[in-house]
Amino acid sequence: MTRTVMCRKYKEQLPGLERPPYPGAKGQDIFEHISQQAWADWQKHQTMLINEKRLNMMNAEDRKYLQGEMDKFFAGEDYAQAEGYVPPAE
């Protein structure tokens, strides 16, 4: 049976992650409060930010910036967007 969580991002019961994505308290918090859908959406957005803003994951400041944006993304706050990006029309 699929484990469900009350997703912090989408404010509804959705399938949860299979395991914490990070070690420690941060990973456990994501595991308990973020759905698979929200995590997949974050990974797409994270990739866009890394590419468009040319972030270097070897740089501690860039990792800290990205983690801050992840927190905003999941909390429903305003988060950084790639300049000039227009989502595809459905």
Swiss-Prot record:
It comes from the Bacteria. Transmembrane segments: none annotated. Keywords: Iron. The keyword Transferase does not apply. GO terms for biological process: cellular response to oxidative stress. InterPro entries: Fe_traffick_prot_YggX, Fe_traffick_prot_YggX_sf. One of its GO terms (cellular component) is cytosol. Pfam families: Iron_traffic. GO terms for molecular function: iron ion binding. PANTHER family: FE(2+)-TRAFFICKING PROTEIN-RELATED. Could be a mediator in iron transactions between iron acquisition and iron-requiring processes, such as synthesis and/or repair of Fe-S clusters in biosynthetic enzymes. Belongs to the Fe(2+)-trafficking protein family. HAMAP family: Fe_traffic_YggX. This is Probable Fe(2+)-trafficking protein. It comes from Pseudomonas putida (strain W619). The lineage of its organism: Bacteria, Pseudomonadati, Pseudomonadota, Gammaproteobacteria, Pseudomonadales.
